[in-house]
Swiss-Prot record:
GO terms of molecular function: metal ion binding; UDP-3-O-acyl-N-acetylglucosamine deacetylase activity
EC number: 3.5.1.108
GO biological process: lipid A biosynthetic process
Recorded metabolic or biological pathway in which this protein acts: Glycolipid biosynthesis; lipid IV(A) biosynthesis; lipid IV(A) from (3R)-3-hydroxytetradecanoyl-[acyl-carrier-protein] and UDP-N-acetyl-alpha-D-glucosamine: step 2/6
Protein name: UDP-3-O-acyl-N-acetylglucosamine deacetylase
Annotated function: Catalyzes the hydrolysis of UDP-3-O-myristoyl-N-acetylglucosamine to form UDP-3-O-myristoylglucosamine and acetate, the committed step in lipid A biosynthesis.
The keyword Ligase appears for this protein: no
Keywords, ordered alphabetically: Hydrolase, Lipid A biosynthesis, Lipid biosynthesis, Lipid metabolism, Metal-binding, Zinc
Keyword Hydrolase: yes
Source species of the chain: Cupriavidus metallidurans (strain ATCC 43123 / DSM 2839 / NBRC 102507 / CH34)
The reaction(s) this protein catalyses: a UDP-3-O-[(3R)-3-hydroxyacyl]-N-acetyl-alpha-D-glucosamine + H2O = a UDP-3-O-[(3R)-3-hydroxyacyl]-alpha-D-glucosamine + acetate
Binding site for Zn(2+): 78, 237, 241
Family: Belongs to the LpxC family.
Amino acid sequence: MLKQRTIKSLVKTVGIGLHSGRKVTLTLRPAPADTGIVFTRVDLPEAVEIHAAASAIGDTRLASVLQKDGARVSTVEHLMSACAGLGVDNLYVDVDAEEIPIMDGSAASFVFLLQSAGMEEQPAAKRFIRVKKAVEVRDGDKLARLEPFFGFKLAFTIDFRHPAVDKTGQTFTIDFADTSYVREIARARTFGFAHEVEALREMGLARGGSLDNAIVLDEHRMLNNEELRYGDEFVRHKILDAIGDLYVIGHPLIASYVAHKSGHGMNNQLLRALLADQEAYEFVTFDKVEEAPVAFLPQAQPAFA
C-alpha cells in the first residue's frame, strides 16, 4: 500500500513577513493520518484553524491566502509547494502572524525544515485525485488546464516582455517521473519589479521585501548582485507557485497541468472548476505500491523530492 506521510518531529523557524516586514515564528508539527495540511493562527485570542482547501482560498491578488472567520494566512504557496514536493500529506502549521515568512523567496528553506524533521509513513493509504477529463479556465490570453495523465507533469509559459526575463527561458516543462523537485524547482525565487514594490509599499505592503528574498527588476535589468540560480529561474518559480497552489486541493493530483501566464487566482479557479465537475475526477488509492505513478513511489521519492 502506498501510505500517507507526515513529519517525525516538531521543527520551528523564524522569518520575515513579506508584506508586514515583521518577525514571524513558524512551527511545523506531525499530524495524524487523514488530517491534511492545517494552518493555525496561534497569535489570535482564540486560535483559528484553517484547513488547506480550494474553497478556503480568498484573496489571490499578491499570493494565495487562506481565510476563515475573518482570520487569514497569506503566502502559503511556497510551503504548500514544499509539502507537495516531499510528499507530505498531513501537517500542522502554527504561525503567529497573518502570513507565512517569505524566507529566501523560494521553497528551499521549507524543504530543509521538512527534511530536518524527517519523514514518517502512516498506516493509511495515500489518497490521490486523478483527473479523468480535461478542465480549463481562461481569461483573455491567459489559461490554465488540467488533463488526464498517469503521473504529475507541469508545463508553464510566461510572457513578461522584459529584457532580463526575455533572455531566459520562457517555457519550462517538468515530469516528476524522472526529475527532482528539490534539485530543479525548490530553489527558484519569487520575482518582482521595482516600481511595483514601491507602489505596494505606499499601500503599506511589501515592507519585508528585499534583494534577500526576491529577484528585483528595474526597467532594464536585475538589481540583485547574485546570479540566477537557474538559467530560467523566472518560469521555474511560476511552476513552484503552481505546485503549491494546486496542492491546496488537499491531495496529490494525478494529472498534467498546462498554463500560459497563469497566477494564483487562475490556479484556484482551475481547482474549483475541477471540483465542480464530478465526472472530471475521482479519488484513488494504490494497494500495490508498484501500481502507482512512478513520481509518487517511495523508492522514487528522491525523484519527486
